[in-house]
Regions:
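Active-site-proximal loop->helix
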Residues: 33, 56, 99-118, 243-247, ...
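Conserved thiamine diphosphate
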Residues: 108-146, 178-183, 265, 310-311, ...
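Phosphate/diphosphate-binding loops
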Residues: 253-303
Length: 373
């Protein structure tokens, strides 16, 4: 049995059922062994695409994505995708191999760790056969717990070596990763932010990917109906509020003219499960008159060089929204926002031929890209 067989078995044991790959010297034997274990493969024509597909797989399945490219120039090609995965906190494991230990010279040799850490990802270098299975388990557990991608580098001559009489103990990271459970808000903080919500006259509620994962969409719609808020989403959460007639689609750079007007006029933005990135706030210019309430398991104060939120509720997205709804019911004479205001905005959105009024030339027989947003 070769060492790459053990590597493949250890990765298969982590619940991996699919791998996105572009093969080369540093990963071909490992990939072959993994395929023989009935792990299906999707092959890319560019290394960046392999990582991007693994990112999409992780987002759809909720499980860490697996990609593999060769060492050296194969790794340098994935830096854009790897950086994007770090910023989006997408759990991902990338197996890249490494230049051979015993070669006196190797044309594609580079110091890989600095490239990986420059992207914000973590690098695990496997150099000792007795630690192979444990380091692979650790890589998967770290990405599952932190959402930070982990890159595994292992010299390909070490991969091709005989395993010998060493014991093989393989354990799944999922058996050791603790369940995070739901995050419940502090009652005192709920009362404080509820008072803020009750006073809002032109509220806007924005749902992000965290709201999608927490199944907070229906609760957000109920809160919006209660306080007279219009509904928007970040681009990754597009469609979350499609059942509401008061949904103005996405916020940020792709926002419609009507959505932008709602944000500019709003006095309170309730951001649920979104990272409050610069794109969603038009670099902070989109809400000039609004206080921002962030409901998230990891509330953000500063984001990308600006103050992102003024008020915070640390909670699971659905639980936090439901807590505010319940607290609003206890406030006598709670003044909700202007339902007439949001009805007018919804009517304007429906009447618009396109989300924005900017001139845009569309060639004959070509789909207008605005129809995709």
């Amino acid at each position: 049995m070769k060492t790459y067989d053990v590597v493949a078995k250890a990765i298969k044991a982590q619940g991996v059922g699919h791998c996105f790959a572009l093969l080369g010297d540093g990963n071909m034997h490992f990939a072959g062994a993994l395929a023989h274990l009935d792990v299906s493969f999707t092959y890319a024509r560019h290394e960046h695409c392999a990582v991007s597909m693994a990112m999409a797989y992780a987002r759809v399945t909720g499980q860490p994505g697996l990609a593999t490219v060769t060492c050296g120039p194969g790794l340098t090609q994935v830096m854009t995708g790897l950086s994007a995965a770090v910023r989006a906190r997408i759990p991902l494991v990338l197996f890249v191999g490494e230049s051979p230990l015993r070669a006196s010279w190797y044309n594609q040799e580079i110091d890989q760790a600095p490239f990986v850490t420059a992207c914000g990802a973590e690098y695990v270098r496997i150099l000792h056969k007795p630690r192979v299975t444990r380091q692979i388990q650790d890589a998967f557990s770290r990405t599952q717990m932190s959402g930070i991608p982990v890159v595994i580098g292992m010299p390909f001559d070490l991969q091709e070596s005989e395993w010998g009489n060493l014991n093989v103990t393989i354990e799944a990271a999922s058996d050791f990763v603790p369940s995070a459970g739901k995050v419940f808000p502090d009652p005192g903080v709920v009362d404080a932010v509820t008072a803020l919500v009750a006073q809002a006259k032109r509220p806007v509620l924005i749902g992000g990917r965290g709201a999608v994962l927490a199944d907070a969409g229906p609760s957000c719609i109920r809160l919006a109906d209660k306080i007279g808020a219009v509904l928007l989403t970040s681009l990754p959460a597009r469609g979350l509020f499609h059942r509401s007639i008061h949904s103005l689609n996405v916020v940020g750079g792709f926002a419609s003219d009507t959505a932008r007007k709602a944000c500019l006029d709003s006095d309170l933005v309730i951001a649920v499960g979104t990272s409050l990135a610069s794109h969603s706030a038009d670099a902070g210019r989109l809400y000039p008159n609004a206080k921002i309430l962030h409901i998230d398991t990891h509330p953000i104060i500063y984001q990308q060089g600006r103050v992102a939120a003024h008020h915070h509720l640390c909670a699971d997205a659905k639980i936090g929204v439901d807590a505010i709804l319940n607290a609003l019911g206890d406030i006598k004479g709670c003044s909700s926002g202007s339902h007439e205001w949001r009805d007018e905005l919804a009517a304007q959105q429906k009447a618009a031929e396109y989300p924005d009024a900017l001139p845009f030339q569309v060639a004959p027989d070509v789909i207008d890209p605005r129809q995709m947003i």
